[in-house]
Amino acid sequence: MVPFPRILGIETSCDETAAAVVERDAEGHSRILSDVVLSQLDEHSAYGGVVPEIAARAHVEALDELIEEALMRANVSLADVDAIAATSGPGLIGGLLVGLMTGKAIAKAAGKPLYAVNHLEGHALTARLTDGLSFPYLMLLVSGGHTQLILVRGVGDYERWGTTIDDALGEAFDKTAKLLGLPYPGGPAVERMARDGNAGRFDFPRPLVGEARLDFSFSGLKTAVRLAAQEIAPLSDQDVADICASFQRAISRTLKDRIGRGLQRFKREFPSIGETPALVVAGGVAANLELRATLQGLCDKNGFRFIAPPLSLCTDNAVMIAWAGLERMAIGVAPDALDVQPRSRWPLDANAERLIGFGKRGAKA
């Protein structure tokens, strides 16, 4: 293995086009040499969500220049890069095709190995880049396409303990915002309105709370919000703020129950891991300050470290893709063949039951 490998990462699974260069030394320490992300928010905001065809075209238009910029910011050329890592799933198939085909072309032309990376694995391993975290640990992934509680045992070794049985949490935020006439993306808009709201005005349901299994459900909560809004329409600004605050409180209480049970299970299964156990949160919804505070308090109560990587590394980015490639390289995983195909569905836990449905931001995995 190259003693100080350097990887170019490419991410195009949804509505961010990203490229990054990351290197790792023999002790596992990393350096982010560049991190370039182009959001497609303006392209999709008029539609209230991500339009797959528009996303794919935007990736085509932007990716080559972003890769050049990532190399320039890192002050390296392709000759200085040891491998290419590109997201190959899960996600929107059009975007995945753009990124993976670009990665293949670069790997072929430059004579570099290619790592086809699972987007979820990128999220799962980010805390090892930012915090030097050791295995095992728990990860809560909360985004527009996924809500999963995952046991991370090692690189390529994952067990899904819980997942949404309907809407992802980010999807619930977006749909609630749209219902209330708030702008896209919905998460930040709902959080802003909630700051001025009365969280006790509406007693929204907390689906699956109290159940032993660790799954999530948010469609019933979304329906309750719609019915409450219809009952008091037309809505004043204060009504909207109160609904948002009550919605967030219901989610916080749901996560407190679901994740609390997960932390207890972790302690039962790993009673003596030699260090303080950790809960990692990732995904765009991880930016929500109320949810972070809930998880921090839960971890404090249960004797866990709470790790939330910087927001730029919680949302979709190419740093995590490059890092996942480096992690695989470090344990001797062979590169992928150049005929590897993108996968719209690609669960981290190959033994997990297949999920039903197709989320707002792509196939559920």
From Swiss-Prot:
A Pfam match: TsaD
Location(s) in or outside the cell: Cytoplasm
Cofactor binding annotation: Binds 1 Fe(2+) ion per subunit.
Binding positions (substrate): 141-145, 174, 187, 288
Binding residues annotated for Fe cation, in chain numbering: 119, 123, 316
Reactions performed catalytically: L-threonylcarbamoyladenylate + adenosine(37) in tRNA = N(6)-L-threonylcarbamoyladenosine(37) in tRNA + AMP + H(+)
CDD domains (alphabetical): ASKHA_NBD_TsaD_bac (cd24133)
GO CC list: cytoplasm
Name of the protein in question: tRNA N6-adenosine threonylcarbamoyltransferase
Organism the protein comes from: Rhizobium etli (strain CIAT 652)
